[in-house]
Amino acid sequence: MESTLIKGSMVAIITPFKNGKIDEVGYEKLIKREIANGINVIVPVGTTGESATLTHEEHRVCIEIAVDTCKGTDVKVLAGAGSNATHEAIGLAKFAQDHGADAVLSVAPYYNKPTQQGLYLHYKEIANSVEIPVLLYNVPGRTGCDIKADTVIRLFRECKNIIGVKEASGDIDRCVDLLSREPHMTVVSGEDSINYPILANGGKGVISVTANLLPDYVAKLCDYALKGDFVKSREINNELYELNKILFVESNPVPIKAAMYIAGLIETLEYRLPLCEPSKENYKKIEETIKKYKIKGL
């Protein structure tokens, strides 16, 4: 199914913690900042939102805050709702739908190492359980599971509410293959380093980590590309190159949270174990890079 809702600039929003718990006030402020700076879609509780170390109750709280904060605006909510257990993924997807999310992002089932047929059946069950759009999330470097292009195409053609895929494999050829066969599919970049080439090849948008820091830049990058002005889009992409690179000097979301703390966007630098603070050397590199960009704290 072609989607007109989930497109453009999307932020993979972090989950701020304070004294070991979700900083709900800080979370709402971060979302409002994204809205004010032109972001089209908020994506809570994905990889960047540390969904893997949140309880199901915390997961639900993040979705509720995102939906409530976006009410009365044109900004959509694409709620993270994946699991390596199909029944759990269905439960999260239903919760997201029932609480007002516009669509769900469903990560490939990690650790289990299912076959392509298993992936097909997993996503078919999820799609049949809800009416809102479902965006697949392919990130084999983290899940150990690769949703092959043929499987994505099959699901897109057979399931009316599967709209496409967040492609975070880093494989631009994969994205071109998908779009050459299904030009109306929602293929979005899941890696900031390849945002521009995916947009230039017909991608519908980006789910960005960098947008946590510079939402206005990412919004303009997408707006220009979707209007066909690839010269201006590329210029912005090139401006973000150094920042995009440093934000993956360690595993996401370790660098982005450090960068946001340095920029004054979050009050405390807290992670959930086994994630921890970056090395002193990398923290210094992040700090030096952040100083080159004009980022206003909250």
From Swiss-Prot:
Binding annotation for pyruvate: 48, 207
Compartment(s) of residence: Cytoplasm
Methyltransferase recorded as keyword: no
GO BP annotation list: diaminopimelate biosynthetic process; lysine biosynthetic process via diaminopimelate
Predominant cellular place of this UniProt entry's protein: cytoplasm
SUPFAM superfamilies per the UniProt record, alphabetical: Aldolase
GO cellular component: cytosol
Pathway: Amino-acid biosynthesis; L-lysine biosynthesis via DAP pathway; (S)-tetrahydrodipicolinate from L-aspartate: step 3/4
EC number: 4.3.3.7
GO molecular function terms attached to this record: 4-hydroxy-tetrahydrodipicolinate synthase activity
Site (Part of a proton relay during catalysis): 47, 111
Highest taxon listed in the record's lineage: Bacteria
Catalytically driven reaction(s): L-aspartate 4-semialdehyde + pyruvate = (2S,4S)-4-hydroxy-2,3,4,5-tetrahydrodipicolinate + H2O + H(+)
Active site: 137 (proton donor/acceptor), 166 (schiff-base intermediate with substrate)
Regions crossing the membrane: none
Record's keyword annotation contains Amino-acid biosynthesis: yes
Keywords: Amino-acid biosynthesis, Cytoplasm, Diaminopimelate biosynthesis, Lyase, Lysine biosynthesis, Schiff base
Recorded family membership: Belongs to the DapA family.
Quaternary structure and partners: Homotetramer; dimer of dimers.
The protein's role, per its UniProt record: Catalyzes the condensation of (S)-aspartate-beta-semialdehyde [(S)-ASA] and pyruvate to 4-hydroxy-tetrahydrodipicolinate (HTPA).
Record-linked NCBIfam families: dapA
Descriptive protein name: 4-hydroxy-tetrahydrodipicolinate synthase
Lineage: Bacteria, Pseudomonadati, Campylobacterota, Epsilonproteobacteria, Campylobacterales
